[in-house]
A protein has these predicted regions:
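A conserved beta-turn-beta hairpin within the catalytic core of GNAT-like acetyltransferases
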Residues: 61-69, 79, 203-217, 264-268
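Conserved GNAT acetyl-CoA-binding A-motif
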Residues: 95-110, 237-247
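Conserved acetyl-CoA-binding loop-helix of GNAT-fold acetyltransferases
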Residues: 74, 80-94, 116, 120, ...
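Amide-forming acyltransferase catalytic core, primarily the GNAT-like/NAT-type
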Residues: 121-210
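Conserved beta-strand in the GNAT
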Residues: 46, 52-60, 68, 73, ...
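Conserved catalytic-core motifs of GNAT/GCN5-like acyltransferases
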Residues: 104-107, 124-138, 263-274
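Conserved active-site alpha-helix within GNAT-family acetyltransferase domains
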Residues: 85, 109-127, 249-264
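Active-site rim helix/loop that mediates acceptor-substrate recognition in acyltransferases
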Residues: 13, 20-58, 164-194
Length: 276
């Protein structure tokens, strides 16, 4: 079976949405992010068999130059027939062309098929994570004293927390490696906040689908104060919920979110990576 690979240009978008619907049922987001994907480095690849779009997959270059593998979808009738493998080969070609120092992805901790495909191309488990969410409150929220952190100050401000967060900052299930380039990029996009008087620091925002959730990637200092500010941001941005995703080892943060009404969204997740 021959699999032809080409970019998913706008004329193929409807077919790509059908592939996603077939593969993911109610967990679809491509329609919301396609225009955003066009602004990023890295290709949304389409895998065609006999002229039919059978699968899609996106490589996105993040702030630190690493490649993030996402939106890998194969239509049910084409699964386990080499389509996913072909897309992964294209991932590796792009990574070489774009000089990505790392490739990373995430999947469910119990998703044997997805993890197995990644391991065939050298990716290994890096960390296990758990995701919590809390409905946004229309009444709660207080932002007094919080200010955005300048990009040239973000890395130094956030560095002390890198170990506690096991080296990752997570938004929209995009697992950013905790480093200077990531901290600068987050700050440049208005996602790093500080309350000077209390020493509270928060990284919050959304990579995309800002109306679906405000993602809290880091919360330190007076966490109750930070959570109140997160509620305010969610209300201002029309986000339906607060989402927090962190490594299983971060028991202190897990205890805080549970005590404040957050609930686990589903099964645990894992991020996998390869150094190129």
């Amino acid at each position: 079976m021959e699999v032809l690979l080409r970019p998913v240009t706008p004329e193929y978008l409807d077919a790509a949405l059908r592939v996603e619907q077939g593969a993911m049922q109610n967990h679809c987001y491509l329609a919301d992010v396609y225009e955003y994907y066009l602004t990023t480095a890295g290709e949304l690849t389409g895998a065609f068999v006999d002229g039919e779009l059978a699968g899609i997959g996106k490589l996105t270059v993040l702030w630190d130059g690493s490649g993030w593998l996402e939106t890998l979808r194969v239509a049910p009738q084409w699964q386990r027939r080499g389509v996913g493998t072909a897309i992964y080969r294209r991932y590796m070609e792009q990574a070489a062309q774009l000089r990505c120092p790392y490739l990373r992805m995430y999947t469910g901790a119990k998703n044997v098929a997805s993890a197995g495909l990644a391991r065939r191309f050298g990716l290994e488990t890096a960390m296990l994570f758990r995701e919590y969410a809390l409905p946004a409150s229309p009444e709660q929220g207080d932002g007094a004293g919080f200010a955005p952190v300048p990009a040239d100050e973000a890395a130094e401000l956030l560095a002390p927390w890198a170990r506690r967060y096991n080296g990752y900052l997570v938004m929209n299930r995009t697992f950013y490696r905790f480093n200077e380039q990531t901290c600068r990029g987050l700050a440049q996009n208005g996602r790093v906040w500080r309350h000077e008087a209390s020493g509270t620091v928060m990284v919050a925002g959304a990579r995309f689908q800002s109306d679906k959730g405000l993602h809290i990637a880091l919360l330190e200092g007076d966490r109750a104060r930070g959570l109140a500010f997160a509620q305010l941001l969610a209300r201002q941005r029309g986000a339906g919920r607060l989402v927090c995703n962190f490594a299983l080892e971060n028991a202190e943060l897990e205890s805080f979110v549970r005590q404040n009404g957050f609930a686990v969204t589903g099964g645990d997740l894992m991020t996998m990576e390869i150094r190129l």
